[in-house]
């Protein structure tokens, strides 16, 4: 009987050790992920490398769309995904999508997305400057920050931008504030979703 008890106790201790080891590994992975996320948030908050992060995101999304929809042989789905993800009707035709060199096609979509984004940024700046000048003239110098609402048709957010700096930079500061706010929102929402999924996994 005492041998049976010892064997059972040893088995329980081995199981507990395995559980503790897995929890430590889980915590280690979570810490590494947390460091990456906080690094991305720092880039967004302080502007460090934010442009590079956005540029990299364009490339990663372009690569994912091409490889994913090409594998499914779904050109129409690809065209729709370009509209949803990049807000553009791609010039990549069905023949090129299906048979072109994948790296060249990815590069083309990335270039289209980057150029479209740059044009929209320029339009935003051009359209915003008269409004900001009007605010300065009609409201006087006591206005420091302006809240600008933005929406993609599904979600809306308010972007706070400094009035003087936006005027001094010909709207560049507004574009930067928008990029920061969107990037932080996307990172935070994805991180919360990831934490919920990891908690479910931990259970």
Please tell me what each predicted stretch does.
Residues 1-203:
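Extended, charged helical/alpha-beta scaffold domains that provide interaction surfaces
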């Amino acid at each position: 009987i005492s041998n049976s008890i010892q064997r059972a106790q040893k088995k329980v201790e081995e199981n507990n050790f395995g559980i503790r080891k897995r929890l430590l590994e889980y915590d280690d992975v979570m810490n590494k992920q947390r460091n990456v996320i906080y690094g991305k948030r720092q880039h967004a908050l302080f502007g460090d490398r934010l442009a590079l992060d956005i540029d990299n995101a364009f490339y990663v999304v372009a690569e994912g769309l091409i490889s994913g929809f090409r594998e499914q042989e779904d050109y129409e789905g690809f065209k729709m995904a370009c509209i949803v993800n990049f807000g553009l009707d791609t010039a990549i035709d069905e023949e090129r999508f299906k048979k072109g060199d994948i790296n060249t096609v990815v590069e083309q979509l990335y270039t289209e997305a980057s150029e479209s984004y740059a044009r929209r940024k320029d339009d935003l700046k051009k359209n915003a400057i008269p409004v900001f000048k009007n605010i300065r003239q009609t409201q006087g110098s006591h206005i420091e920050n302006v809240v600008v609402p933005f929406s993609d048709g599904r979600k809306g957010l308010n972007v706070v931008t400094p009035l003087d700096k936006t005027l001094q930079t010909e709207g560049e500061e507004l574009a930067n504030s928008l990029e920061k706010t969107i990037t932080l929102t996307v990172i935070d929402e994805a991180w919360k979703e990831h934490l919920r999924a990891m908690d479910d996994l931990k259970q």
